[in-house]
Amino acid sequence: MQLPRELKYAAIAGGVALFGLIFGWVLFPTILKSQLKKEMALSKKTDVRKMWEKIPFALDFKVYIFYFTNAEEVQKGATPILKEIGPYHFDEWKEKVEVEDHEEDDTITYKKRDVFYFNPEMSAPGLTGEEIVVIPHIFMLGMALTVARDKPAMLNMIGKAMNGIFDDPPDIFLRVKVLDILFRGMIINCARTEFAPKATCTALKKEGVSGLVLEPNNQFRFSIFGTRNNTIDPHVITVKRGITNVMDVGQVVAVDGKTEQTIWRDTCNEFQGTDGTVFPPFVPETERIESFSTDLCRTFKPWYQKKTSYRGIKTNRYIANIGDFANDPELNCYCSKPDTCPPKGLMDLAPCMKAPMYVSLPHFLDSDPALLTKVKGLNPDVTQHGIEIDYEPITGTPMVAKQRIQFNIQLLKTDKLDLFKDLSGDIVPLFWIDEGLSLNKTFVNMLKHQLFIPKRVVGVLRWWMVSFGSLGAVIGIVFHFRDHIMRLAVSGDTKVSKVIPEVEEQKDISVIGQAQEPAKVNI
């Protein structure tokens, strides 16, 4: 039996509407999700894997240094007056080396290598890196703080060692060129033959102090970041590839072959989160994104703040802070003991980096207000000093990331060392870094063309197919049954009643109105 032409058109239009409904709301999201699962995994053939192994553009690495303008007074116990100098801008290139895949457990191992190049054009106007700054002597203070904490009975010997190693310093401050203290290094004189300096230098060499490089003739060179520059990090990191389960992509499962740390207490020793360079897709804003920092030996869990956009792509902004270890049960295990936590907003780096320093947000943002009363010259601002990530939730791509961390040290006060007896004992800032990532136009456009433009086209097309298909089906049905509809309109069961005007009873004209005789008037 052949369908009438109008019903054929209606069937075709209805099919278009049904296809638009099924494809637009069922098939396409399923296909997209399946494709993303393949693309976001760290398999060898994906673009994500290539970018994960070697980021094809430089990150912004900015350093701000606090100049102690009243060092002589601080030596006598006065409140430090600080002047922030910066940024000193460095181009940071990141790559993963010695990469090995392990099919049996869907993991991948690697080591890190970072390379820094000073960029004077992107630094603050006039800064060359040759400026001389006055800051607390990080190495000298570090030695004193470590001995005071671990072997206080040896403080007297350390005092003699300092006089030999640092040539009888007049105070605990360092006057040094910026690039020397950051990368090039400053000489630590270990050529002295006296017992105290020699014994101390032998211990330094044995311990392998962070930032220290052995030079010829028993000299050491110390810098903050120099040992990281163009050097392969010794730690072997193991993460999930996400081929078996894409939601596990980038998850840290071991460092140096160990599946947990031994430096904290309880759950703080667990590896939670990704390595910070890749995140799983399809994360709802109600969930936190987690990343494990091998530099700080801890997990950060940024939380959702608000909707944002970057170069036309919708993103979710997540923010983070250091935390309040004393009052947050989840973070209390980062304290050496439950009741010996640092002030809010500070984290002790000694267990992780072997360095007696504290990290915080810059300018003590979101920290114990008492910290701001110990120094002058700080102005915390959430827009300039906060940690934030603009995260594309479908692919899990960080579009913009700003990791800002400040390094602080305690001005140790002790009567056993002449240079330290009048110090305040307060925690003061040394410098802070702003490590930033912003996807450039090339990679944003690539993301748009591979994902968002097809998604928008399908979004428009599905509504067009459903709307016009439904309309076409209705019109076809109406045209097919139009004659029948018209007949129903005119014949049907409805009867037409004949209206017969009512005939009124004839009346004589006299009945209509009786003549009235005029009233007689007597004159």
Swiss-Prot record:
Taxonomic superkingdom: Eukaryota
Keywords linked to the UniProt accession: Cell membrane, Disulfide bond, Glycoprotein, Membrane, Olfaction, Receptor, Sensory transduction, Transmembrane, Transmembrane helix
Compartment(s) where it occurs, according to its Swiss-Prot or TrEMBL record: Cell membrane
Pfam families linked to this entry: CD36
Residues passing through the membrane, by range: 12-32, 459-479
Record InterPro entries: CD36_fam (IPR002159)
Main location: membrane
Topology with respect to the bilayer: Multi-pass membrane protein
One cellular component (GO) term of this entry: cytoplasm
Extracellular-side positions: 33-458
Family membership: Belongs to the CD36 family.
Protein name, entry field: Sensory neuron membrane protein 1
